[in-house]
């Protein structure tokens, strides 16, 4: 049994993976292509890994959980805040029409650009993720992979009516994972405690 299959079987048993489309997307993307050479032997362990500059590639269970919550559709226009090494966007790109992913750190931005060069439906942008990216809005789904002190208002503004956003909100170290639906009357929010993401830095987030 391959290491990847063993990991995905584990994620299914633990109920992080619930749908065939998310499993298929994770089967199609080699996580080992997005981690440091020295960490390739850990690529299919369920753990976050450093990618440099204080940033990480999320643990596979968190990738699966966020993608399942978003219920991605083949017609979706998706915004990701925090490109990292590009793995999260790569998996999501298998399920949606278009991905815009924003990264503020130049080294990490360049890493994502290199890793995502062959993905023709992913647009990597260097900028302040807390401001979103209005040029490609509105978005059907927004996936935030860094922890914010509050939900940045521009992200709500750029979310389509009926759209979903998943975002860690709390402190610099520990957060709750919020699922936000934008409606004609405002927003509805559900919460899952006990997640840990690197902090979001920006105009509408933490100071550097």
Q: At which residue positions do the language-model features occur?
A:
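Conserved nucleotide-cofactor-binding alpha/beta core module
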Residues: 71-188
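Class I SAM-dependent transferase core
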Residues: 1-79, 87-91, 95, 108-118, ...
């Amino acid at each position: 049994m391959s290491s990847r299959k063993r990991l995905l079987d584990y994620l299914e048993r633990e109920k992080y993976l619930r749908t065939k489309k998310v499993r298929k997307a994770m089967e199609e993307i080699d996580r080992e292509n997005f981690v440091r050479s020295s960490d390739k032997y850990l690529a299919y362990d369920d753990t976050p890994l450093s990618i440099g500059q204080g940033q990480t590639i999320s643990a596979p269970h968190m990738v699966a959980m966020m993608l399942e919550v978003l219920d991605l559709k083949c017609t979706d226009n998706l915004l990701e805040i925090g490109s990292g090494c590009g793995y999260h966007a790569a998996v999501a790109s298998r399920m949606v029409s278009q991905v815009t992913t924003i990264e503020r750190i130049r080294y990490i931005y360049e890493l994502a650009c290199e890793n995502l060069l062959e993905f023709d439906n992913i647009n990597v942008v260097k900028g302040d993720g807390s401001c979103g990216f209005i040029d490609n809005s509105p978005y059907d789904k927004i996936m935030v992979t860094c922890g914010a002190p509050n939900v940045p208002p521009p992200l709500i503004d750029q979310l389509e009516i009926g759209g979903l956003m998943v975002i860690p909100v709390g402190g610099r170290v520990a957060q709750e994972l919020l699922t936000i639906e934008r409606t004609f009357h405002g927003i509805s929010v559900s919460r899952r405690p006990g997640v840990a993401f690197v902090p979001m830095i920006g105009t509408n987030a933490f100071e550097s």
